Amino acid sequence: MAMGKALSVKWTREHLLIALNLYCKLPFGRFNHRNPVLIEVASKMGRTANSLVMKLCNFASLDPIHRARGVVGLKGASKQDRLVWDEFQTDTATLGLASEQLLHDIFTADDDRELDFLQRDRVRLEPVTRFAMPVGPTEVQATVRARRGQQFFRQAVLTAYDVRCCITGIAIPRLLVASHIKPWGEFPTDRLNPRNGLCLSSLHDAAFDAGLITVDDRMRVVISRELKGYLPQESLARNFLAYEGRRIRKPEKLADPDWSCLEYHRTKIFTG
């Protein structure tokens, strides 16, 4: 299909979903027409990096966290932008997966490779063995879809927390996990919802999943009696007790963790 001039390319629903996916994965400070990631994706879409940046800024103007900070974007968010944004808020599972598939397909048809944006200097195609995936009852016959959805969730959650553990501040992507607050296997509709996620180090993710730590209604770290029962241990004191009562780092986009998800974790998973 002939694209003509890049600026004349219409914003289709498919292109909007790709832009929304990028919005979830790139920090606000990287919305720049010189960003090599945006240049590469825009080229695949047949449009200019400037037009893609403008769309990302329009999505930023709809983001409640950025609105609270006074970010107003370009004040040019269209009705179509708002509809896609609102649909994403109410049906993240469907749109998250659809956007990830669209973005994947403009780069490769190889289902054994996934896109990685966390290095931020360029788009990387990584072998699937790099990506761990939670196991649930519906995944047996849908490994590609599940992996792709998990890839979206991981990159969206890590980017929302500036690729730092929200408890310790560790900023090494290989050591970070997009931890589900409500379990992956039990709540299919929240599997891809970034508000059902926390960016944690692998150690703190394991403790969170086991109910040894949680987050209270003031966003402070709570340590269980069970974990404290293993004291005294210098490593426990350094890695857990040092953060007890401290507020977790809050996300920089897409809204704070869902209160109902955190309440579920406190009442159903946390060992007390």
PLM region descriptions:
Residues 23-33:
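Short helix->loop/beta-hairpin flanking segments within DNA-binding domains
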Residues 152, 170-173, 182-272:
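A detector for short metal-coordination/catalytic motifs
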Residues 125-164, 182-195:
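Short, charged surface segments at domain edges that flank catalytic/cofactor-binding sites
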Residues 37-42:
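Short alpha-helical "recognition helix" segments of helix-turn-helix
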